[in-house]
Amino acid sequence: MKIKKFTAASMQEAALLIRKELGNEAVILNSKKIKKRKWFGLVNKPAVEVIAVLDQDFLEKKTPQKAAEPKQTLKTPVSSPKIEERTYPPQIPAQQELGDFSAYQSVLPEPLRKAEKLLQETGIKESTKTNTLKKLLRFSVEAGGLTEENVVGKLQEILCDMLPSADKWQEPIHSKYIVLFGSTGAGKTTTLAKLAAISMLEKHKKIAFITTDTYRIAAVEQLKTYAELLQAPLEVCYTKEEFQQAKELFSEYDHVFVDTAGRNFKDPQYIDELKETIPFESSIQSFLVLSATAKYEDMKHIVKRFSSVPVNQYIFTKIDETTSLGSVFNILAESKIGVGFMTNGQNVPEDIQTVSPLGFVRMLCR
Protein backbone atom coordinates (compact mmCIF):
# COMPACT_ATOMS: atom_id res chain seq x y z
CA MET A 1 0.00 0.00 0.00
CA LYS A 2 1.31 3.44 -0.97
CA ILE A 3 -0.01 6.79 0.18
CA LYS A 4 1.01 10.13 -1.30
CA LYS A 5 0.13 13.82 -1.00
CA PHE A 6 -0.23 15.88 -4.19
CA THR A 7 -0.48 19.66 -4.59
CA ALA A 8 -1.88 21.10 -7.83
CA ALA A 9 -3.66 24.14 -9.22
CA SER A 10 -6.92 22.22 -9.73
CA MET A 11 -8.53 18.83 -9.14
CA GLN A 12 -8.14 18.03 -12.84
CA GLU A 13 -4.40 18.66 -12.65
CA ALA A 14 -4.16 16.65 -9.40
CA ALA A 15 -5.96 13.74 -11.06
CA LEU A 16 -3.44 13.75 -13.90
CA LEU A 17 -0.53 13.73 -11.43
CA ILE A 18 -2.08 10.85 -9.48
CA ARG A 19 -2.67 8.78 -12.62
CA LYS A 20 0.89 9.43 -13.75
CA GLU A 21 2.52 8.37 -10.47
CA LEU A 22 0.11 5.83 -8.97
CA GLY A 23 -1.92 4.66 -11.96
CA ASN A 24 -5.63 4.53 -12.72
CA GLU A 25 -6.42 2.24 -9.78
CA ALA A 26 -5.41 4.83 -7.18
CA VAL A 27 -8.21 6.25 -5.06
CA ILE A 28 -8.48 9.73 -3.55
CA LEU A 29 -8.62 9.52 0.23
CA ASN A 30 -9.00 13.21 1.02
CA SER A 31 -8.85 16.62 -0.68
CA LYS A 32 -8.96 20.27 0.38
CA LYS A 33 -8.29 23.76 -0.92
CA ILE A 34 -5.11 25.52 0.21
CA LYS A 35 -3.17 28.70 -0.47
CA LYS A 36 0.05 28.04 -2.32
CA ARG A 37 2.79 30.61 -1.68
CA LYS A 38 4.88 32.04 -4.50
CA TRP A 39 7.35 34.89 -4.91
CA PHE A 40 8.91 34.74 -1.44
CA GLY A 41 5.54 34.34 0.26
CA LEU A 42 4.15 37.62 -1.12
CA VAL A 43 1.53 35.97 -3.34
CA ASN A 44 -0.96 33.32 -2.22
CA LYS A 45 -2.21 31.29 -5.15
CA PRO A 46 -5.30 29.04 -4.77
CA ALA A 47 -4.50 25.33 -5.03
CA VAL A 48 -5.77 21.92 -3.98
CA GLU A 49 -4.07 19.36 -1.78
CA VAL A 50 -5.04 15.74 -2.44
CA ILE A 51 -4.15 12.54 -0.59
CA ALA A 52 -4.29 9.42 -2.78
CA VAL A 53 -3.74 5.78 -1.94
CA LEU A 54 -2.82 2.74 -4.01
CA ASP A 55 -3.37 -0.68 -2.45
CA GLN A 56 -1.59 -3.12 -4.75
CA ASP A 57 -2.15 -6.13 -2.45
CA PHE A 58 -5.90 -5.48 -2.47
CA LEU A 59 -5.99 -5.11 -6.25
CA GLU A 60 -4.25 -8.46 -6.73
CA LYS A 61 -6.75 -10.24 -4.46
CA LYS A 62 -9.84 -8.44 -5.78
CA THR A 63 -12.21 -10.46 -7.99
CA PRO A 64 -14.57 -8.87 -10.53
CA GLN A 65 -18.21 -8.44 -9.48
CA LYS A 66 -20.95 -8.27 -12.10
CA ALA A 67 -23.38 -6.08 -10.19
CA ALA A 68 -20.87 -4.02 -8.31
CA GLU A 69 -21.42 -0.32 -7.82
CA PRO A 70 -19.10 1.79 -9.98
CA LYS A 71 -15.99 2.69 -8.01
CA GLN A 72 -15.25 6.30 -7.32
CA THR A 73 -12.83 7.67 -9.89
CA LEU A 74 -10.09 10.17 -9.50
CA LYS A 75 -12.35 12.88 -10.89
CA THR A 76 -14.55 12.77 -7.78
CA PRO A 77 -12.85 12.99 -4.40
CA VAL A 78 -13.99 10.72 -1.60
CA SER A 79 -16.37 12.55 0.69
CA SER A 80 -15.05 12.84 4.20
CA PRO A 81 -15.43 15.00 7.31
CA LYS A 82 -14.02 18.52 6.96
CA ILE A 83 -10.38 18.67 7.94
CA GLU A 84 -8.86 21.88 9.21
CA GLU A 85 -6.48 23.64 6.85
CA ARG A 86 -2.87 23.18 7.81
CA THR A 87 0.55 22.96 6.22
CA TYR A 88 2.45 19.71 6.32
CA PRO A 89 6.00 19.48 7.69
CA PRO A 90 8.55 19.50 4.86
CA GLN A 91 10.45 16.58 6.36
CA ILE A 92 7.53 14.19 5.74
CA PRO A 93 8.39 12.18 2.58
CA ALA A 94 6.08 12.73 -0.39
CA GLN A 95 5.49 9.01 -0.88
CA GLN A 96 5.77 6.41 1.86
CA GLU A 97 5.28 2.65 2.00
CA LEU A 98 2.86 1.93 4.84
CA GLY A 99 5.24 0.62 7.47
CA ASP A 100 6.54 3.40 9.67
CA PHE A 101 3.72 5.18 11.49
CA SER A 102 5.61 8.38 12.19
CA ALA A 103 6.50 8.92 8.54
CA TYR A 104 2.96 9.38 7.25
CA GLN A 105 0.95 10.30 10.35
CA SER A 106 0.37 13.92 9.30
CA VAL A 107 -1.13 13.04 5.90
CA LEU A 108 -3.92 10.92 7.38
CA PRO A 109 -7.42 12.35 7.76
CA GLU A 110 -8.38 13.17 11.35
CA PRO A 111 -10.44 9.97 12.03
CA LEU A 112 -7.55 7.77 10.92
CA ARG A 113 -5.04 9.80 12.94
CA LYS A 114 -7.27 9.21 15.96
CA ALA A 115 -7.19 5.45 15.26
CA GLU A 116 -3.42 5.54 14.78
CA LYS A 117 -2.95 7.27 18.14
CA LEU A 118 -5.20 4.72 19.82
CA LEU A 119 -3.22 1.86 18.28
CA GLN A 120 0.04 3.36 19.52
CA GLU A 121 -1.31 3.37 23.07
CA THR A 122 -2.42 -0.29 23.08
CA GLY A 123 1.06 -1.79 23.26
CA ILE A 124 0.41 -4.32 20.49
CA LYS A 125 3.15 -5.34 18.06
CA GLU A 126 4.28 -2.85 15.43
CA SER A 127 3.43 -5.24 12.59
CA THR A 128 -0.10 -5.60 13.96
CA LYS A 129 -0.48 -1.83 14.20
CA THR A 130 0.60 -1.41 10.59
CA ASN A 131 -1.68 -4.16 9.27
CA THR A 132 -4.61 -2.76 11.24
CA LEU A 133 -4.09 0.73 9.85
CA LYS A 134 -3.84 -0.71 6.33
CA LYS A 135 -7.23 -2.38 6.80
CA LEU A 136 -8.71 0.85 8.15
CA LEU A 137 -7.38 2.79 5.16
CA ARG A 138 -8.75 0.19 2.77
CA PHE A 139 -12.15 0.29 4.46
CA SER A 140 -12.13 4.09 4.39
CA VAL A 141 -11.48 4.08 0.65
CA GLU A 142 -14.23 1.54 -0.07
CA ALA A 143 -16.78 3.12 2.27
CA GLY A 144 -16.16 6.68 1.15
CA GLY A 145 -14.49 7.78 4.36
CA LEU A 146 -14.65 7.27 8.11
CA THR A 147 -15.99 9.62 10.75
CA GLU A 148 -14.80 10.37 14.27
CA GLU A 149 -17.83 8.44 15.51
CA ASN A 150 -17.40 5.17 13.60
CA VAL A 151 -13.62 4.85 13.29
CA VAL A 152 -13.17 3.38 16.79
CA GLY A 153 -15.91 0.82 16.21
CA LYS A 154 -14.32 -0.28 12.93
CA LEU A 155 -10.91 -0.42 14.60
CA GLN A 156 -12.29 -2.68 17.34
CA GLU A 157 -13.96 -4.89 14.72
CA ILE A 158 -10.65 -5.37 12.89
CA LEU A 159 -8.81 -6.21 16.11
CA CYS A 160 -11.56 -8.68 17.11
CA ASP A 161 -11.09 -10.54 13.83
CA MET A 162 -7.46 -11.24 14.80
CA LEU A 163 -8.46 -13.08 17.99
CA PRO A 164 -9.67 -16.67 18.50
CA SER A 165 -13.36 -17.05 17.63
CA ALA A 166 -15.98 -16.21 20.27
CA ASP A 167 -16.96 -19.86 20.79
CA LYS A 168 -13.51 -20.45 22.34
CA TRP A 169 -14.09 -17.83 25.04
CA GLN A 170 -16.12 -17.81 28.26
CA GLU A 171 -16.30 -21.60 28.48
CA PRO A 172 -18.07 -22.35 31.78
CA ILE A 173 -16.74 -24.73 34.41
CA HIS A 174 -18.19 -28.02 33.20
CA SER A 175 -15.69 -30.81 33.89
CA LYS A 176 -15.28 -32.73 37.11
CA TYR A 177 -11.62 -31.77 37.49
CA ILE A 178 -10.43 -28.19 37.03
CA VAL A 179 -6.64 -27.87 36.83
CA LEU A 180 -4.73 -24.58 36.92
CA PHE A 181 -1.04 -24.41 36.01
CA GLY A 182 1.49 -21.76 35.05
CA SER A 183 4.68 -20.07 36.18
CA THR A 184 5.36 -18.89 39.71
CA GLY A 185 3.68 -15.70 40.86
CA ALA A 186 0.84 -15.80 38.34
CA GLY A 187 -1.83 -16.07 41.04
CA LYS A 188 -3.01 -19.65 40.48
CA THR A 189 -4.02 -20.46 44.07
CA THR A 190 -6.12 -17.33 44.59
CA THR A 191 -7.74 -17.78 41.18
CA LEU A 192 -8.54 -21.41 41.98
CA ALA A 193 -10.21 -20.30 45.22
CA LYS A 194 -12.32 -17.77 43.31
CA LEU A 195 -13.55 -20.40 40.86
CA ALA A 196 -14.27 -22.86 43.67
CA ALA A 197 -16.17 -20.27 45.70
CA ILE A 198 -18.34 -19.31 42.72
CA SER A 199 -19.05 -22.97 41.99
CA MET A 200 -20.11 -23.62 45.58
CA LEU A 201 -21.81 -20.38 46.60
CA GLU A 202 -23.49 -19.43 43.32
CA LYS A 203 -23.89 -22.76 41.51
CA HIS A 204 -24.48 -24.79 44.71
CA LYS A 205 -22.02 -27.49 43.64
CA LYS A 206 -20.28 -29.96 45.94
CA ILE A 207 -16.56 -29.16 45.70
CA ALA A 208 -13.18 -30.44 46.88
CA PHE A 209 -9.53 -29.42 46.50
CA ILE A 210 -6.36 -31.22 45.46
CA THR A 211 -2.92 -29.64 45.48
CA THR A 212 0.26 -31.00 43.91
CA ASP A 213 2.24 -27.95 45.03
CA THR A 214 4.47 -29.71 47.54
CA TYR A 215 7.40 -27.32 47.02
CA ARG A 216 6.04 -24.43 49.05
CA ILE A 217 4.54 -24.89 52.50
CA ALA A 218 2.95 -21.46 52.23
CA ALA A 219 1.03 -22.51 49.11
CA VAL A 220 -0.47 -25.55 50.85
CA GLU A 221 -1.38 -23.44 53.88
CA GLN A 222 -2.99 -20.80 51.67
CA LEU A 223 -5.18 -23.37 49.92
CA LYS A 224 -5.97 -25.04 53.24
CA THR A 225 -7.28 -21.69 54.52
CA TYR A 226 -9.59 -21.34 51.53
CA ALA A 227 -10.74 -24.96 51.92
CA GLU A 228 -11.61 -24.37 55.57
CA LEU A 229 -13.54 -21.20 54.75
CA LEU A 230 -15.58 -23.08 52.17
CA GLN A 231 -15.79 -26.19 54.38
CA ALA A 232 -14.39 -28.28 51.53
CA PRO A 233 -11.95 -31.22 51.83
CA LEU A 234 -8.35 -30.92 50.64
CA GLU A 235 -5.88 -33.62 49.62
CA VAL A 236 -2.13 -33.07 49.11
CA CYS A 237 -0.68 -35.32 46.39
CA TYR A 238 2.99 -36.02 45.83
CA THR A 239 2.69 -38.70 43.16
CA LYS A 240 0.46 -39.88 40.34
CA GLU A 241 -0.72 -42.74 42.55
CA GLU A 242 -1.77 -40.34 45.29
CA PHE A 243 -3.56 -38.21 42.74
CA GLN A 244 -5.49 -41.28 41.58
CA GLN A 245 -6.40 -42.10 45.20
CA ALA A 246 -7.67 -38.55 45.70
CA LYS A 247 -9.82 -38.87 42.59
CA GLU A 248 -11.41 -42.01 43.99
CA LEU A 249 -11.94 -40.30 47.35
CA PHE A 250 -13.77 -37.43 45.64
CA SER A 251 -15.75 -39.55 43.18
CA GLU A 252 -19.07 -38.26 44.54
CA TYR A 253 -18.17 -34.58 44.23
CA ASP A 254 -19.35 -32.30 41.41
CA HIS A 255 -16.09 -30.41 40.93
CA VAL A 256 -12.55 -31.00 42.18
CA PHE A 257 -10.26 -27.97 41.91
CA VAL A 258 -6.59 -28.85 41.42
CA ASP A 259 -3.73 -26.48 42.29
CA THR A 260 -0.24 -27.11 40.91
CA ALA A 261 3.25 -25.91 41.75
CA GLY A 262 4.42 -22.58 40.40
CA ARG A 263 7.94 -23.02 39.05
CA ASN A 264 10.38 -21.16 36.83
CA PHE A 265 8.96 -21.54 33.32
CA LYS A 266 12.51 -21.95 31.95
CA ASP A 267 12.83 -25.27 33.80
CA PRO A 268 11.67 -28.12 31.47
CA GLN A 269 11.56 -30.49 34.46
CA TYR A 270 8.50 -28.64 35.76
CA ILE A 271 6.41 -29.61 32.72
CA ASP A 272 7.57 -33.23 32.95
CA GLU A 273 6.63 -33.42 36.64
CA LEU A 274 3.23 -31.89 35.92
CA LYS A 275 2.46 -34.53 33.29
CA GLU A 276 3.77 -37.30 35.53
CA THR A 277 1.51 -36.33 38.42
CA ILE A 278 -1.70 -35.38 36.60
CA PRO A 279 -3.16 -37.66 33.92
CA PHE A 280 -4.62 -35.16 31.46
CA GLU A 281 -7.78 -36.76 30.10
CA SER A 282 -11.27 -35.80 28.93
CA SER A 283 -12.60 -35.40 32.49
CA ILE A 284 -10.06 -32.62 33.15
CA GLN A 285 -10.62 -28.98 32.22
CA SER A 286 -7.23 -27.28 32.18
CA PHE A 287 -6.33 -23.59 32.29
CA LEU A 288 -2.95 -22.00 31.68
CA VAL A 289 -2.69 -19.04 34.06
CA LEU A 290 -0.72 -16.03 32.78
CA SER A 291 -0.06 -12.71 34.48
CA ALA A 292 -1.14 -9.72 32.38
CA THR A 293 1.83 -7.82 33.84
CA ALA A 294 4.34 -10.17 32.19
CA LYS A 295 6.39 -9.08 29.19
CA TYR A 296 5.22 -10.37 25.82
CA GLU A 297 8.42 -12.35 25.19
CA ASP A 298 8.19 -14.06 28.60
CA MET A 299 4.51 -14.82 28.05
CA LYS A 300 5.32 -16.27 24.64
CA HIS A 301 8.02 -18.46 26.19
CA ILE A 302 5.61 -19.74 28.85
CA VAL A 303 2.99 -20.65 26.25
CA LYS A 304 5.63 -22.51 24.25
CA ARG A 305 6.81 -24.39 27.35
CA PHE A 306 3.28 -25.60 28.08
CA SER A 307 2.51 -26.53 24.47
CA SER A 308 2.92 -30.23 25.31
CA VAL A 309 0.16 -30.00 27.94
CA PRO A 310 -3.52 -29.87 26.86
CA VAL A 311 -4.81 -26.32 27.47
CA ASN A 312 -8.55 -25.65 27.22
CA GLN A 313 -8.35 -21.92 27.86
CA TYR A 314 -6.20 -19.14 29.26
CA ILE A 315 -6.78 -17.28 32.50
CA PHE A 316 -5.16 -13.84 32.61
CA THR A 317 -4.58 -12.45 36.09
CA LYS A 318 -3.66 -9.01 37.47
CA ILE A 319 -5.30 -7.02 34.68
CA ASP A 320 -5.80 -4.28 37.27
CA GLU A 321 -2.03 -4.04 37.79
CA THR A 322 -1.09 -3.07 34.22
CA THR A 323 -1.75 -0.02 32.08
CA SER A 324 -1.51 -1.97 28.82
CA LEU A 325 -3.02 -5.25 27.65
CA GLY A 326 -0.92 -5.30 24.48
CA SER A 327 1.06 -8.39 25.53
CA VAL A 328 -2.18 -10.26 26.20
CA PHE A 329 -3.51 -9.29 22.76
CA ASN A 330 -0.27 -10.38 21.07
CA ILE A 331 -0.48 -13.83 22.68
CA LEU A 332 -4.15 -14.30 21.81
CA ALA A 333 -3.63 -13.13 18.22
CA GLU A 334 -1.01 -15.87 17.77
CA SER A 335 -3.10 -18.56 19.44
CA LYS A 336 -6.19 -20.66 18.76
CA ILE A 337 -6.97 -20.73 22.49
CA GLY A 338 -9.54 -18.37 23.99
CA VAL A 339 -9.89 -16.75 27.40
CA GLY A 340 -11.87 -18.42 30.16
CA PHE A 341 -11.47 -15.80 32.86
CA MET A 342 -9.65 -12.62 33.81
CA THR A 343 -8.92 -11.50 37.36
CA ASN A 344 -8.70 -7.92 38.56
CA GLY A 345 -7.90 -8.05 42.28
CA GLN A 346 -7.36 -10.23 45.35
CA ASN A 347 -10.92 -10.39 46.67
CA VAL A 348 -12.41 -13.90 46.72
CA PRO A 349 -14.62 -14.57 44.85
CA GLU A 350 -15.52 -11.12 43.50
CA ASP A 351 -12.47 -10.12 41.47
CA ILE A 352 -12.85 -12.47 38.52
CA GLN A 353 -14.79 -12.10 35.30
CA THR A 354 -15.50 -13.66 31.95
CA VAL A 355 -14.93 -11.63 28.81
CA SER A 356 -15.83 -11.85 25.12
CA PRO A 357 -13.43 -10.98 22.27
CA LEU A 358 -15.17 -7.62 21.79
CA GLY A 359 -15.21 -6.98 25.52
CA PHE A 360 -11.47 -7.61 25.68
CA VAL A 361 -10.76 -5.34 22.71
CA ARG A 362 -12.73 -2.56 24.39
CA MET A 363 -10.57 -3.02 27.48
CA LEU A 364 -7.49 -2.90 25.26
CA CYS A 365 -8.59 0.37 23.63
CA ARG A 366 -9.86 2.15 26.74
UniProtKB/Swiss-Prot annotation:
<dbReference type="GO" id="GO:0005047">
    <property type="term" value="F:signal recognition particle binding"/>
</dbReference>
<dbReference type="InterPro" id="IPR020006">
    <property type="entry name" value="FlhF"/>
</dbReference>
<keyword id="KW-0472">Membrane</keyword>
<dbReference type="GO" id="GO:0005525">
    <property type="term" value="F:GTP binding"/>
</dbReference>
<keyword id="KW-0342">GTP-binding</keyword>
<dbReference type="InterPro" id="IPR055157">
    <property type="entry name" value="FlhF_N"/>
</dbReference>
<dbReference type="GO" id="GO:0005886">
    <property type="term" value="C:plasma membrane"/>
</dbReference>
<dbReference type="GO" id="GO:0015031">
    <property type="term" value="P:protein transport"/>
</dbReference>
<dbReference type="InterPro" id="IPR000897">
    <property type="entry name" value="SRP54_GTPase_dom"/>
</dbReference>
<keyword id="KW-1003">Cell membrane</keyword>
<comment type="function">
    <text>Necessary for flagellar biosynthesis. May be involved in translocation of the flagellum.</text>
</comment>
<dbReference type="GO" id="GO:0006605">
    <property type="term" value="P:protein targeting"/>
</dbReference>
<keyword id="KW-1005">Bacterial flagellum biogenesis</keyword>
<dbReference type="GO" id="GO:0044781">
    <property type="term" value="P:bacterial-type flagellum organization"/>
</dbReference>
<keyword id="KW-1006">Bacterial flagellum protein export</keyword>
<dbReference type="Pfam" id="PF22510">
    <property type="entry name" value="FlhF_N"/>
</dbReference>
<feature type="binding site">
    <location>
        <begin position="317"/>
        <end position="320"/>
    </location>
    <ligand>
        <name>GTP</name>
    </ligand>
</feature>
<keyword id="KW-0813">Transport</keyword>
<keyword id="KW-0653">Protein transport</keyword>
<dbReference type="GO" id="GO:0006614">
    <property type="term" value="P:SRP-dependent cotranslational protein targeting to membrane"/>
</dbReference>
<dbReference type="GO" id="GO:0042802">
    <property type="term" value="F:identical protein binding"/>
</dbReference>
<dbReference type="Pfam" id="PF00448">
    <property type="entry name" value="SRP54"/>
</dbReference>
<dbReference type="InterPro" id="IPR027417">
    <property type="entry name" value="P-loop_NTPase"/>
</dbReference>
<dbReference type="GO" id="GO:0003924">
    <property type="term" value="F:GTPase activity"/>
</dbReference>
<feature type="region of interest" description="Disordered">
    <location>
        <begin position="64"/>
        <end position="85"/>
    </location>
</feature>
<comment type="similarity">
    <text>Belongs to the GTP-binding SRP family.</text>
</comment>
<feature type="binding site">
    <location>
        <begin position="259"/>
        <end position="263"/>
    </location>
    <ligand>
        <name>GTP</name>
    </ligand>
</feature>
<feature type="binding site">
    <location>
        <begin position="182"/>
        <end position="189"/>
    </location>
    <ligand>
        <name>GTP</name>
    </ligand>
</feature>
<protein>
    <recommendedName>
        <fullName>Flagellar biosynthesis protein FlhF</fullName>
    </recommendedName>
</protein>
<keyword id="KW-0547">Nucleotide-binding</keyword>
<dbReference type="InterPro" id="IPR047040">
    <property type="entry name" value="FlhF__GTPase_dom"/>
</dbReference>
